[in-house]
Regions:
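Canonical positions in the second alpha-helix
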Residues: 38, 71-72, 105-106, 139-140
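Structural marker of alpha-solenoid helical repeat scaffolds
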Residues: 41, 74-76, 109-110, 143
Length: 164
């Protein structure tokens, strides 16, 4: 489509899927192109703007990310993806306590609980608090008993706490 300079119409959900595809591939330049094209068609879409925030974070454009967080803050506090982006923003800037606050808000929405507990636990590891990290890795395992990441980190926390 880009190479042939063709224009196609996609609804918001289709653009979101395209952007997620490129984000998961780690192809942030194509994700950014998809976001920009999507915003030219759907300039007021909060979902697309949240994906733009994800792209800014991956590209480490923290000034633009903060501007977008400020713009979306009031209208997106009930959106798990937005709250995770805020948590990632503060985590990347070395503020794990603020990151945990946003993850706690997202947990109240009862979506992606396994991911959020792992995220919170990782932040507690960054704070050198293996006890609280262990609690959240264990909670993540309660939501997904087959999560190898959580299980490995539970063992790591027990080791850090010198528990058999």
């Amino acid at each position: 489509m880009i190479e042939n300079n063709e224009e196609f119409y996609f609804d918001t959900e289709e653009y979101i899927e395209i952007i997620i595809y490129y984000l998961e591939l780690g192809d942030y330049s194509y994700a950014e192109m998809a976001v920009n094209h999507a915003l030219s068609i759907h300039p007021n879409s909060l979902e697309i703007k949240t994906k733009q925030l994800e792209v800014f974070l991956e590209l480490e454009r923290y000034v633009k990310a903060k501007e977008l967080i400020d713009e979306l803050h009031q209208s997106s506090l009930e959106d798990t993806d937005f709250l995770v982006c805020c948590a990632k923003y503060y985590s990347n800037l070395g503020n794990p306590k603020k990151s945990i606050e946003y993850c706690q808000r997202a947990l109240q929405l009862e979506e992606e609980e396994n991911f959020l507990h792992n995220f919170i636990a990782d932040e507690y590891v960054n704070l050198d608090d293996p006890f609280n990290a262990l609690k959240h890795y264990t909670s993540a395992l309660e939501h997904d008993p087959f999560d190898d990441y959580s299980l490995e980190n539970v063992m790591l926390c027990y080791n850090l706490l010198n528990r058999p």
